[in-house]
């Protein structure tokens, strides 16, 4: 079993649909439901980063809230996040749920549009956590505590405006985006 001592982030994901669907007039979940009803022979395929992910949960919750059965009305497929935009552009998927930078890439390249933000679907949802196995946490309690403390110190450092330029310089390097 895995245990978590710390939430690392909340919210931060978006549901992106292809610019082609947008050009067809799909601007809302209601529009998407109507498009599905008008084209019963077409499978609308949507990508997510993993079947055991918040992205899957968000997609399913959002679709179901709009009267779309995620198991019957659309096809859900797992795609690694760095491949989302290319698959959207190629027409392999109609949309996806992911975090940045992939959403920004889709929007900035004109390939996709934001249909929904996770903040609007499930406000305050946990996104990333520090997870360790229970066995490890019990075997190394001081190391576990030191890890949590180090992460909290790093958070404080990143949150300090005096360190803003340095932090931005680090996280905006090409290998991280």
Where do the protein language model's features map onto the residues?
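Short, glycine-/small- and polar/acidic-enriched structural segments
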Residues: 1-77, 93-104, 111-124
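Short gly/pro-enriched beta-turn/loop segments at secondary-structure junctions
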Residues: 124-125, 166
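Short acidic active-site motifs
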Residues: 83-84, 102
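Hydrophobic residues within well-ordered alpha-helices
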Residues: 87-89
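Secondary-structure end/capping motifs
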Residues: 140-177
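A bilobed periplasmic-binding-protein/Venus flytrap-type ligand-binding module shared by bacterial periplasmic
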Residues: 13-25, 126-143, 157
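Second-shell loop/turn segments in exported
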Residues: 45-49, 135, 155-159
């Amino acid at each position: 079993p895995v245990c978590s001592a710390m939430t690392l982030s909340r919210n931060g994901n978006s549901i992106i649909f292809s610019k082609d669907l947008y050009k067809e007039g799909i601007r809302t979940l209601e529009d998407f439901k109507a498009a599905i009803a008008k084209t019963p022979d077409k499978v609308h395929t949507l990508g997510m980063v993993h079947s055991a992910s918040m992205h899957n949960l968000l997609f399913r919750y959002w679709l179901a809230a709009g009267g779309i059965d995620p198991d019957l009305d659309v096809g859900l497929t797992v795609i690694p996040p760095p491949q989302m935009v290319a698959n959207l552009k190629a027409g392999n998927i109609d949309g996806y749920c992911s975090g940045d930078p992939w959403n920004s890439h889709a929007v900035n390249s004109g390939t996709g549009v934001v249909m929904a933000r996770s903040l609007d679907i499930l406000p305050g949802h946990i996104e990333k956590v520090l997870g360790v196995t229970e066995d490890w946490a019990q075997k190394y309690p001081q190391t576990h505590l030191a890890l949590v403390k180090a992460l909290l110190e790093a958070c404080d450092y990143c949150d300090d405006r005096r360190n803003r330029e340095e932090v931005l310089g680090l996280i905006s390097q090409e290998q991280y985006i």
